[in-house]
């Protein structure tokens, strides 16, 4: 039986381990922390639970592709309850409130009541969300998709919908917010994530929520990780906690590999053979070396190419991201949790 070492016990690492076990591989996940889950985590503080990750979960709608995957890895189960909120989130400014409701028409009407002068941008935003919702909830078969679009009764024509779609590409949240005149409407877009984030992330996330594909699993982040960990272990997978990996061991012998491409279909110059080396194990920080047939890095990409492997192994596509900080900025984030004496609405 071939052996796979997986570095990192987060959602990616647990998923890789589960699918590898189902495929018949021997697997060991090495996780540096005392609990699995990675960023999908939470803490108990003074009688409160602080969830670090899942504010909504893409793939909660039955029948969606992601829902099937979540069930395969044990993140969701048929017996698990889903928390279905009425609103995605609520923003407040100067004593006024506005929400992104599951009912998008309610969102539209409340936005229009607050700022009639923003009617054009409000309709553009809501219609785009409805369009994205329709596309995301369809099977995306060409005939079905065209039929669905023909049945739409938006306030915009098809040509205008295409124009609206193009208008959102390349915008960040701050640029989207500044399209609106009313400060409260500006705030609801800026309260989602950092202002530098691409605007389409909000549009997609909200459309997932509207379609019932972005609800919250009961138990939150820790519950999802617990179910996935139990699924992995029930399949016979090994999980080593508090065991950081220091380095991936590379075999010195060079291999000559034919490109995995059908050269007859390419109208380019002759492709050269690939010169590569095999990774055949890892060295742990405790000094122990472990051999394996395959290594999967399911950890931070920066740690992978600056610690586990030499910088010379960084692919050109990733090197471009590292060297161009203007077009590919990196953000830091922090989370603040407040203890409130009283009941809160959504």
Task: Give the residues covered by each predicted segment.
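A general beta-strand register signal
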Residues: 44, 92, 240, 283-284
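Mid-domain catalytic core of redox enzymes
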Residues: 216, 246-346
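Secondary-structure transition/capping motifs at alpha-helix termini
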Residues: 21-26, 76, 223, 229-242, ...
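Feature captures the FAD/FMN-dependent oxidoreductase FAD-binding
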Residues: 92-111, 115-118, 132-133, 233-234, ...
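Generic beta-strand/beta-sheet core signal
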Residues: 7, 30, 242, 297-299
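Active-site/ligand-binding neighborhood in enzyme catalytic cores
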Residues: 130-235, 242
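Short, solvent-exposed loop/turn and secondary-structure capping segments
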Residues: 39-40, 188, 306-309
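N-terminal glycine-rich phosphate/pyrophosphate-binding loop and immediately adjacent elements
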Residues: 2-134
């Amino acid at each position: 039986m071939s052996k796979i070492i997986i570095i990192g016990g987060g959602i990616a690492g647990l998923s890789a381990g589960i699918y590898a076990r189902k495929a018949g591989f021997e697997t060991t996940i090495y996780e540096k922390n005392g609990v699995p889950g990675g960023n999908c985590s939470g803490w108990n503080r003074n009688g409160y639970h602080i969830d670090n990750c899942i504010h909504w979960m893409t793939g909660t709608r039955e029948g969606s592709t992601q829902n099937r995957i979540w069930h395969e890895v044990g993140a969701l189960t048929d017996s698990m309850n889903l928390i279905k909120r009425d609103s995605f989130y609520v923003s407040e400014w100067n004593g006024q409130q506005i929400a992104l409701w599951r009912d998008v028409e309610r969102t539209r009407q409340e936005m229009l009541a607050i700022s009639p002068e923003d009617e054009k941008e409000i309709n553009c935003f809501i219609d785009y969300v409805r369009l994205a919702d329709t596309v995301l909830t369809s099977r995306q078969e060409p005939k079905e998709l065209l039929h669905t679009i023909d049945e739409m009764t938006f306030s915009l024509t098809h040509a205008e919908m295409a124009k609206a779609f193009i208008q959102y590409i390349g915008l960040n949240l701050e640029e989207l917010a500044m399209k609106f005149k009313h400060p409260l409407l500006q705030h609801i877009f800026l309260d989602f994530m950092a202002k530098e984030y691409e605007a389409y992330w909000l549009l997609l996330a909200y459309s997932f929520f509207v379609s019932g594909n972005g609800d919250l699993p009961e138990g939150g982040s820790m519950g999802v990780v617990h179910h996935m960990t139990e699924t992995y272990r029930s399949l016979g997978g090994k999980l080593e906690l508090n065991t950081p990996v220091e380095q991936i061991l590379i075999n010195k012998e060079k291999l000559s590999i034919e490109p995995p491409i059908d050269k007859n279909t390419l109208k380019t110059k002759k492709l050269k053979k690939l010169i590569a080396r095999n990774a055949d194990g890892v060295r742990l920080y405790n000094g122990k070396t472990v051999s394996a047939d395959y290594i999967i890095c399911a950890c931070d990409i920066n740690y992978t190419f600056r610690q586990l492997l030499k910088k010379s192994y960084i692919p050109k596509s990733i090197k471009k991201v590292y060297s161009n900080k203007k077009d590919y900025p990196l953000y830091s984030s922090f989370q603040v949790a407040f203890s409130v004496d009283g009941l809160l609405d959504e």
